[in-house]
C-alpha cells in the first residue's frame, strides 16, 4: 500500500473514530438515564403490583437493554478501528 493511501486511510479512520467516540459518550449518557428510568419503573411495579406498572417496567427495561447493546456495538467498533489505526501506523513506519 502506498504511503499516500495509508495516510488517507489513517485520516478516514481517525475521523470515524472521533465520530464513534462522540456517539459512545452520548450512548453512555442515554444508558444511564434509561437504566435509572427502568430501575424506577421496577420499584413502582414492585410497590403497586399492577399489570400496567409491570408493563411499564418491561418497556423501560427493554429500552435500557437495547441501548446497552448499542453501546456495546459502538465500543466494539471503536476497538476495531483503533486496531486498524495501529496497523496503518505500523505500515507507515515500516515504509520509511
Where are these regions (language model features)?
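Short, charge-rich amphipathic alpha-helices with coiled-coil/heptad character
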Residues: 1-17, 89-96
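Amphipathic, non-membrane alpha-helical segments in soluble helical-bundle scaffolds
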Residues: 3, 24-31, 75
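Short, charged, amphipathic alpha-helical segments
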Residues: 11, 29-33, 54-62, 78-84
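N-terminal acidic leader/helix
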Residues: 11-22, 26-29
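Amphipathic alpha-helical coiled-coil segments
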Residues: 20-24, 63-84
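Extended alpha-helical coiled-coil "stalk/arm" regions
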Residues: 27-48, 52
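Short, glycine/alanine-rich amphipathic alpha-helical segment
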Residues: 47-70
Amino acid at each position: 500500500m502506498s504511503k499516500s493511501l495509508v495516510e488517507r486511510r489513517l485520516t478516514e479512520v481517525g475521523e470515524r473514530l472521533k465520530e464513534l467516540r462522540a456517539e459512545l459518550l452520548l450512548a453512555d449518557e442515554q444508558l444511564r438515564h434509561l437504566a435509572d428510568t427502568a430501575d424506577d419503573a421496577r420499584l413502582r411495579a414492585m410497590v403497586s403490583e399492577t399489570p400496567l406498572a409491570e408493563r411499564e417496567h418491561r418497556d423501560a427495561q427493554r429500552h435500557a437493554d437495547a441501548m446497552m447493546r448499542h453501546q456495546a456495538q459502538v465500543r466494539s467498533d471503536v476497538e476495531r478501528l483503533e486496531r486498524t489505526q495501529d496497523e496503518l501506523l505500523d505500515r507507515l513506519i515500516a515504509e520509511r
